[in-house]
């Protein structure tokens, strides 16, 4: 098999949540443990950081990887989903896994996989863990795929666990209350391993506290002592932060939600410092070194790690075009605020969703005065463009329906004046289709 054929095999022969939804979700870690045993427990060969939560875990994971790279570590990064190419999921120092490694891994292990009937994510996780060992990484940042307790990344014992926040998503699998979802996410808390919680509320905080106490895990709530005291959004993109103890630092990632992600990140860096992975800041020389690494890491996250789709400016002007992967109510509560702040003559929104989200909840958050281009991503779970158009009309949102993201985007470009603004989003797959079109 060549690389494309190998990807098709993975997408079609292994149950894939991104394409099939809940029917591809496997409860239990039996397959994961069997794969881990087969490959000789590769994740034990390097340090790991485990990042879960509903929203923000991708940005936090990539930011951590960028800072650790700047500190001189060889850093593995495992995230999902990919937007354009499967290899985005598995990176070392920003470089995607090679096509040849993907092909060789699948071809050499196919006979072992097929009797197990593993899911796509089980195979991909095993590939990532083995690749990081084979390539001798120092540390790997591992993003949870879905939930936490039963996620197949949850066989690692990390240096620190991170849970960014909790909101409603995948409720058919994780539970229909915030407390139930938090309990699933809290499943990544390991005995004696520090855990940082980015955001919590009266419903979720007791869940985290109880689990941490049960596991004798030191717990830090980032909200209790926020490090980011100011965030200035720069016209050209990115954010200028004022951080307690460190002063002003420029971050390259856009998005009104990024200050919360950075607030989550700072206590994680403190844990890594305490464990000797980062320079201690008590001495002037160390403080200067750490500040440089922090500035360089946060200032070049996208460049160092390949992160895309987070308030990404894909066309800077005439008209300006931005895309974002926000896909649930929690994400859109932030995106709607950001869209309200955009200065333009008319806003054009290319929009599509998948069918297992709270579609009405998201539609209610969208700006009523925008012109809409409803579309369907190239994904089996995507809502049909006409159905979405009709559902949106009940929320006072009006526009035409287009069968592909490319056609919707081209229509928006034709209609938009120089001083208009175009936004593309609603799901990761819509953004992925856009980036494929642009590439």
Give residue spans per PLM region.
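Glycine/aspartate-rich loop-and-adjacent alpha/beta segment that forms the canonical ThDP
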Residues: 428-439
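C-terminal helical cap/extension that packs against the catalytic core
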Residues: 201-220, 320-323, 360-421
């Amino acid at each position: 098999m060549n690389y494309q054929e190998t990807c098709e095999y993975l997408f079609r022969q292994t149950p894939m949540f991104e394409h099939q939804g809940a029917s591809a979700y496997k409860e239990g870690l039996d397959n994961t443990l069997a794969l881990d045993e087969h490959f000789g427990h590769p994740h034990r060969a390097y340090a790991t950081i485990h990042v879960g939560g509903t929203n923000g875990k991708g940005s936090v994971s990539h930011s951590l990887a960028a800072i650790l790279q700047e500190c001189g570590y060889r850093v593995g990064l495992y995230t999902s989903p990919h937007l354009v190419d499967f290899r985005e999921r598995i990176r070392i120092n920003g470089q995607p896994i090679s096509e040849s490694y993907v092909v060789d891994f699948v071809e050499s292990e196919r006979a072992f996989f097929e009797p197990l009937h593993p899911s796509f994510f089980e195979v991909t996780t095993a590939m990532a863990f083995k690749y990081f060992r084979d390539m001798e990484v120092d540390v790997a940042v591992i993003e949870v795929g879905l939930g936490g307790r039963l996620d197949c990344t949850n066989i690692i014992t990390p240096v620190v666990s991170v849970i960014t926040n909790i909101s409603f998503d995948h409720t058919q699998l994780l539970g229909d209350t915030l407390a139930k979802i938090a309990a699933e996410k809290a499943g990544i808390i390991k005995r004696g391993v520090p855990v940082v919680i980015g955001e919590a509320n009266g419903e979720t905080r007791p869940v985290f506290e109880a689990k941490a106490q049960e596991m004798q895990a030191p717990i830090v709530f980032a909200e209790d002592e926020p490090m980011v005291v100011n965030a200035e959004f720069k016209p050209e993109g990115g954010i200028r932060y004022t951080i307690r103890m460190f002063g002003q630092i420029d971050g390259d990632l856009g998005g009104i939600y990024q200050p919360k992600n950075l607030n989550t990140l700072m206590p994680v860096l403190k844990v890594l410092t305490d464990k000797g992975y980062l320079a201690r800041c008590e001495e002037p020389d160390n403080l200067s070194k750490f500040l440089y690494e922090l500035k360089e890491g946060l200032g070049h996250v996208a460049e160092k790690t390949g992160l895309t789709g987070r308030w990404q400016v894909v066309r800077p002007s005439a008209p300006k075009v931005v895309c974002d992967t926000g896909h649930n109510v929690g994400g859109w509560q932030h995106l709607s605020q950001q869209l309200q702040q955009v200065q333009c003559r008319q806003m054009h929104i290319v929009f599509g969703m998948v069918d297992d989200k709270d579609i009405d909840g998201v539609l209610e958050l969208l700006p009523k005065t925008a012109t809409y281009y409803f579309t369907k991503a190239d994904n089996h779970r995507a809502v049909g463009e006409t159905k979405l158009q009709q559902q949106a009309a009940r929320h006072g949102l009006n526009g035409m329906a287009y069968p592909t993201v490319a056609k919707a985007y081209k229509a928006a470009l034709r209609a938009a004046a120089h001083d208009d603004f175009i936004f593309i989003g609603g799901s990761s797959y819509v953004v992925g289709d856009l980036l494929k079109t642009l590439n």
